[in-house]
């Protein structure tokens, strides 16, 4: 069954494994999440667990948010996300989900919001090649042809525009270390998002089994 937790991306560092191998890891701080709601097929049409992360000041919370938090006997939360495919009997409204949910060696999917890069051209945004810089060339970094047949720009045409700030999921990352007393997960490799951004860690659904 799926397990999940919400956390904050702290940054990257390096650790040594038991075999003495240096591994780059991303540090994710996941303070205890509160189960805000348990959704069932009978009441909501699907099964899911709603987790809340990071307290939100009362002055910034409206009445519906306060009422929803009161049902879980907690304060309003800044981030609320749903985790599907879980074992509902393992969760109760108001209970906490901690990093102990995972263990070293677990394979997970990590979802975050990619870093924003503002308005960018084709070369940086899509990785296209530039034209010649000299010898009379008039084609340097411009997008190029829009198409030669239809009298409009086709859908999906790669053009300059806003880059980043997209929901990105990286699959099949390995948890190298769990530091329960500091509410920290160390995940091998990099994860999407800027420092201090929200990260959702869930059990990988398409994990590749290791050969015995």
From Swiss-Prot:
Pfam families recorded: Ribosomal_L3
Q: List the Gene3D superfamilies hit by this protein, alphabetically.
A: 3.30.160.810, Translation factors (2.40.30.10)
RNA-binding is among the record's keywords: yes
Q: Which UniProt keywords apply?
A: Ribonucleoprotein, Ribosomal protein, RNA-binding, rRNA-binding
Q: What is an annotated GO biological process for this record, any one? A: translation
Q: Where is this region: Disordered?
A: 119-147
Q: Name one GO cellular component term.
A: cytosolic large ribosomal subunit
User: Could you give a GO molecular-function term held by this entry?
Assistant: rRNA binding
Keyword Cell membrane present in the record's keywords: the answer is: no
Query: InterPro entries in the record, alphabetically?
Result: Ribosomal_uL3, Ribosomal_uL3_bac/org-type, Ribosomal_uL3_CS, Transl_B-barrel_sf
Kindly state the subunit structure of this protein.
Answer: Part of the 50S ribosomal subunit. Forms a cluster with proteins L14 and L19.
Q: Which family does it belong to?
A: Belongs to the universal ribosomal protein uL3 family.
Summary of the function given for this chain in its UniProt record = One of the primary rRNA binding proteins, it binds directly near the 3'-end of the 23S rRNA, where it nucleates assembly of the 50S subunit.
Protein name (Swiss-Prot/TrEMBL)? Large ribosomal subunit protein uL3
Q: Which species does this protein come from? A: Lactobacillus acidophilus (strain ATCC 700396 / NCK56 / N2 / NCFM)
Q: What is the lineage of its organism?
A: Bacteria, Bacillati, Bacillota, Bacilli, Lactobacillales
């Amino acid at each position: 069954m799926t397990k999940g937790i919400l956390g904050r991306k702290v940054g990257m560092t390096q650790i040594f494994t038991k075999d003495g191998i240096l591994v780059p890891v991303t540090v994710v701080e996941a303070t205890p999440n509160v189960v805000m709601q348990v959704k069932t097929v009978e009441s909501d049409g699907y099964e899911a667990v709603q987790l809340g992360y990071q307290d939100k000041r009362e002055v910034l919370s409206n009445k519906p948010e306060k009422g929803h938090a009161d049902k879980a006997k907690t304060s309003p939360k800044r981030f609320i996300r749903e985790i599907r495919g879980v074992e509902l009997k393992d969760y109760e409204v108001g209970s906490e989900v901690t990093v102990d949910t995972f263990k070293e060696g677990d394979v997970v999917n990590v979802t975050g919001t990619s870093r924003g890069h503002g308005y960018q051209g084709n070369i940086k945004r899509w990785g296209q090649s530039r034209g010649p810089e000299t010898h009379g060339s008039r084609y340097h970094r411009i997008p190029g042809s829009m198409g030669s047949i239809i009298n409009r720009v086709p859908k999906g045409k790669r053009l300059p525009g806003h880059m980043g700030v997209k929901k990105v999921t990286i699959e099949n990352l390995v948890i190298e270390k769990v530091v329960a007393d500091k509410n920290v997960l160390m995940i091998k490799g990099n994860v999407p998002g800027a420092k201090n951004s929200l990260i959702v860690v869930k059990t990988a659904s398409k994990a590749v089994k290791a050969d015995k």
